[in-house]
C-alpha cells in the first residue's frame, strides 16, 4: 500500500505481480463473465481488507487456549457500507465476507450520458449513519461526479469527512483530483490508477462498464 502525495488521502494497493495478473484477466474483453466475476471479487477483497486497515483501533488483551495473554487490538466504533448503485453492489459481498452482519446502505446515482452529470434517483441509509465509519463502495472512479454526489449526501446526513473511506477498483487521475479538491479529508483506497479519461468521460485503458459485465447486462 502506498500513499499518493499529489492526490492527498489516496492509498493505492502495492502493484504486485499477483495484482497485475488479476487485472490482466478482468481487463481482457475476451474472457467469460464467470472469470471476470471471480477475479474481480479477489481484487475487491484486497481493497476491502486494506480499507479496514484505516479504521481506528484500541489495544486489547485476550487469553489464549494456552492460558497465555495476547496483546492485540480491537476496532473502535461501528461501521457500515454504502454502495453507489448499481456497480457498487458488486463490492458488497467482499465487505460482508470481512465484516459479518455489516449494515449496507444504497445510493442510486446515474450519469447523464449527454452532460456526464450525476443524477440522484434513490437513497436508503442507516438512520445512525452519522455515528458510523462509512465504507463507500464504487468500483470505478471516472470523473468523480457520482462519488462527490454520494459524499455530499453523507456529509449532509452528519458524517464527517474523516469517517468516510471510499473504496474502488480503478481510479482516474482526474477523478481523484476532483474528489480531493472537494473533500480533501476523505480517504480513498484504490487498486490502481489508470492513465486518464477519453472524450466520453470513460476510464482508459479501463475495462468497460464494470456493473454491466459483473451483473450480466453487457450488450
From Swiss-Prot:
One of its GO terms (biological process) is uracil salvage. GTP binds at residues 33, 42, 76-79, 103, 132. Allosterically activated by GTP. Belongs to the UPRTase family. Keywords: Allosteric enzyme, Glycosyltransferase, GTP-binding, Nucleotide-binding, Transferase. It comes from the Eukaryota. Uracil binds at residues 203, 208-210. Its cofactor is Mg(2+). Pathway: Pyrimidine metabolism; UMP biosynthesis via salvage pathway; UMP from uracil: step 1/1. D-ribose 5-phosphate binds at residue 202. One of its GO terms (molecular function) is GTP binding. It is an enzyme of class 2 (transferase). 5-phospho-alpha-D-ribose 1-diphosphate binds at residues 86, 111, 138-146, 209. Disulfide bonds: none annotated. It comes from Schizosaccharomyces pombe (strain 972 / ATCC 24843). Catalyzes the conversion of uracil and 5-phospho-alpha-D-ribose 1-diphosphate (PRPP) to UMP and diphosphate. This is Uracil phosphoribosyltransferase 1. CDD domains: PRTases_typeI. SUPFAM superfamilies: PRTase-like. GO terms for cellular component: cytosol; nucleus. Its EC number is 2.4.2.9. InterPro entries: PRibTrfase_dom (IPR000836), PRTase-like (IPR029057). Pfam families: UPRTase (PF14681). It catalyses: UMP + diphosphate = 5-phospho-alpha-D-ribose 1-diphosphate + uracil. Binds 1 Mg(2+) ion per subunit. The magnesium is bound as Mg-PRPP. NCBIfam families: PRK00129.1.
Amino acid at each position: 500500500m502506498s500513499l499518493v502525495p499529489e492526490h492527498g488521502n489516496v492509498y493505492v494497493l502495492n502493484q504486485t505481480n499477483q495484482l497485475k495478473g488479476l487485472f490482466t484477466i478482468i481487463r481482457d474483453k475476451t474472457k467469460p463473465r464467470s472469470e471476470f466475476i471471480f477475479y474481480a471479487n479477489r481484487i475487491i477483497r484486497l481493497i476491502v481488507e486494506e480499507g479496514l486497515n484505516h479504521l481506528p483501533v484500541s489495544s486489547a488483551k485476550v487469553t489464549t487456549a494456552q492460558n497465555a495473554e495476547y496483546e492485540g487490538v480491537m476496532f473502535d466504533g461501528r461501521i457500515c457500507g454504502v454502495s453507489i448503485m448499481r456497480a457498487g453492489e458488486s463490492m458488497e459481498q467482499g465487505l460482508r465476507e470481512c465484516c459479518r452482519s455489516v449494515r449496507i446502505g444504497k445510493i442510486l446515482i446515474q450519469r447523464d450520458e449527454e452532460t456526464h452529470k450525476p443524477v440522484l434517483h434513490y437513497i436508503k441509509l442507516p438512520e445512525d449513519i452519522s455515528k458510523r465509519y462509512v465504507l463507500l463502495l464504487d468500483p470505478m472512479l471516472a470523473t468523480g461526479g457520482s462519488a462527490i454526489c454520494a459524499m455530499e449526501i453523507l456529509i449532509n446526513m452528519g458524517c464527517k469527512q474523516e469517517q468516510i473511506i471510499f473504496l474502488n477498483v480503478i481510479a482516474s487521475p482526474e477523478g481523484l483530483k476532483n474528489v480531493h479538491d472537494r473533500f480533501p479529508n476523505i480517504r480513498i483506497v484504490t487498486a490502481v490508477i489508470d492513465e486518464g479519461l477519453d472524450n466520453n468521460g470513460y476510464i482508459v485503458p479501463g475495462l468497460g462498464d464494470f456493473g454491466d459485465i459483473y451483473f450480466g447486462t453487457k450488450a
